[in-house]
Amino acid sequence: MNKRMMTKEQAVLVDRINVLCKERGDTYYTLAYKASIPFTTLMHIIRGDTKNPGLFTVMKICDAFEMSLKEFFDTEEFTSIVNEID
């Protein structure tokens, strides 16, 4: 699936991962290794094949970035999604 076919939520999640990887100089491979998740799992998220990644997987990604779930999701983009739901 390409980015044009992703839901807004998926696109924001992928963008957040991409920004953090770039800031930290991580590749997808190193992120998967640090998060102790299969590389294919991460790539399914990045490509949008996984529509709803599990909380445990997202927590492991946050751990790899050495941040809490709150820090990971504390962005203007995620906040706007939450506000749309309310």
What is each residue range found by the language model?
Residues 21, 46, 57, 76:
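DNA major-groove recognition helix of helix-turn-helix
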Residues 25-44:
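Short alpha-helical DNA-recognition segment
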Residues 21, 32, 62:
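The alpha-helix within a helix-turn-helix
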Residues 1-27:
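A short, Lys/Arg-rich alpha-helix, primarily the initiator
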Residues 1-7, 44, 73-86:
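Short, charged recognition helix plus adjacent turn
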Residues 49-60:
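Short, basic-rich loop-to-helix N-cap that marks the start of a DNA-contacting helix
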Residues 38, 49, 76-80:
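The DNA-recognition helices of helix-turn-helix-type DNA-binding domains
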